Amino acid sequence: MIKRLIGKLIGQKPAKASNPLRISVEEHDIDIRHISPCATRIISTLNQSGHEAYVVGGAVRDLLMGYTPKDFDVVTDATPEQVRRVFRNSRIIGRRFRLVHVYCGGDLVEVSTFRAPHETSNTQDPKGRVLRDNTFGSINEDAIRRDFTVNALFYDMRTEEVLDFCGGYEDTRQSVLRIIGAPAQRLSLIHI
């Protein structure tokens, strides 16, 4: 039983994402009204400013599994500086992984930019820990940079579709936690 669990955990998915599986509103159980008004406003404003923006990660996973998310993260093609210009009540944080905290009312939403594979030359310390990770990329590249398939799900509020680049939708339905890519490499990047 333990071997099977470990096998499921370290099971590899392709490290190349191409066109996503698009799960329509008729196929998934996400009710758009369950997404925080703050995240909804941020995504809508970014879309109106000409940017792509999605709910991403744990919130999408939780909504698909019937849970109430503890927070909502947004990912976009806008750089942190562009996000900051769109939202006056925001602030860029982080050196290693720059993102933007956008405040609305008493809520806080983290807005990150799509990430691309990073260069290892001078971005890691001698122990292999990532020091800087601000290489921006596409939604496809961002998906394969995430830790688990169930955290690489994107919710498009315009179409109400879930975009799945790594098999995370099926993994949520099967209650499987699967690492994306090579487990040893991926786990070395996760800092708890």
Predicted regions and their residues:
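Catalytic cores of the polymerase beta-like nucleotidyltransferase superfamily
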Residues: 1-189
